[in-house]
Amino acid sequence: MTKPSNDEPPLTNVRDLEAMLPLEEEDLTADSQDLEYTAVAHRQQFSTDLVRLYLQDIGRIPLLKRDEEVHIAQQVQSYLRLVEIQNRAAESDAAIDQYQTAIAVHDQLLVQLGHRPSYERWAKILGQTVATLKQTLKSGKKRWAELAGLTVEELENIEKQGITAKAHMIKANLRLVVSVAKKYQNRGLELLDLIQEGTLGLERAVEKFDPTKGYRFSTYSYWWIRQGITRAIATQSRMIRLPVHITEKLNKIKRAQRKISQEKGHTPKIDEVAEELGMTPEQVREVLTQVPRSVSLELKVGQDKDTELMDLLETDTQSPEDELMREALQNDMQEILLDLTPREQEVIALRFGFQDGVAHSLSEIGRILNLSRERVRQIEAKALQKLRHPRRRDRIRDYYENLG
């Protein structure tokens, strides 16, 4: 864990600025209509003042030059490789698992309290003595360093540099978040909330950026920022009242329908869609029954009713950012698949089109591998169970929320 710098950093959370602005008192002698108008005006002015202060704050941070960007990204990746070693070991190494549990509790307390917890409070939550907690941290850090082939001092230096570099990269690109967020105003969320969600997307971009690929970070991070913002609009706004998991299933069904239609030249039946997705026909019908049938895609939505519903739904158009993300997804998937057996790798690669870009049905895979459809299903189920482990699942989850 890294000690905070003595320098006061620019605020990355726009809501942190709220305490800096005084609220004006309402005119209690006004009638109810005037009070409502005054309240709305105050909220609008309050939001404008927050954005202005936020822009002034991040405007003091210099943009990164290309060589600085590469150097900082390398420090982040060096640290994240150590984190990956730790995560892999936690599945079977007791010392690492206990260390991770202790750190997770520390981080939760840090968020709740707003400051670092005392060892006494930290140990109490874990049900340990302070001495036991300190030994857990020492043993876990030592084991982590051993697995990484480093001394504890070397590991802590890389950890400190990586955490500092990650924060630096985020702060240096907050202006891009504001720029993207402004494009999605008046769609159900305030600009401040859009900036907040975009910043979370930026953080994901910093974690996944590979400086050896040759493209600029701004190009790469644009997709992640946009992904964070558009997902927040779909999830939190009141324009579309479908749960996120239903929306995701609908998108999968839509893609399957499109694929079958292109391959077979007819409108797919529910049974065909179900087989393609590994679902039962009843499950597909259940999802489809939750779609409002009377809503026009030309329906005007948003605060000013100037956005069509179609604008918020997926399209078949591939942007350069989407193509870049597909390449990144392929790279991440190749690494994740190494955790599977060779036969499981074959089945998953064919099922999701990782080999030739064509996603095959269970029956097709069975013919290719000379296996029964049921055997292919069993292999796929076992492989997917492994891939659902949080360490692997979280690595690719965000891709599938926006990529088809």
Curated annotation (Swiss-Prot):
SUPFAM superfamilies in UniProt: Sigma2 domain of RNA polymerase sigma factors, Sigma3 and sigma4 domains of RNA polymerase sigma factors
A Pfam family that the UniProt record links to this protein: Sigma70_r2
UniProt xrefs under InterPro entries: RNA_pol_sigma-70_dom (IPR014284), RNA_pol_sigma70 (IPR000943), RNA_pol_sigma70_r1_2 (IPR009042), RNA_pol_sigma70_r2 (IPR007627), RNA_pol_sigma70_r3 (IPR007624), RNA_pol_sigma70_r4 (IPR007630), RNA_pol_sigma_r2 (IPR013325), RNA_pol_sigma_r3/r4-like (IPR013324)
Motif (Polymerase core binding): 193-206
GO molecular function: DNA binding; sigma factor activity
DNA-binding region: 362-381
Protein task: Sigma factors are initiation factors that promote the attachment of RNA polymerase to specific initiation sites and are then released.
Official protein name in the record: Probable RNA polymerase sigma-C factor
Gene from which this protein is expressed: sigC
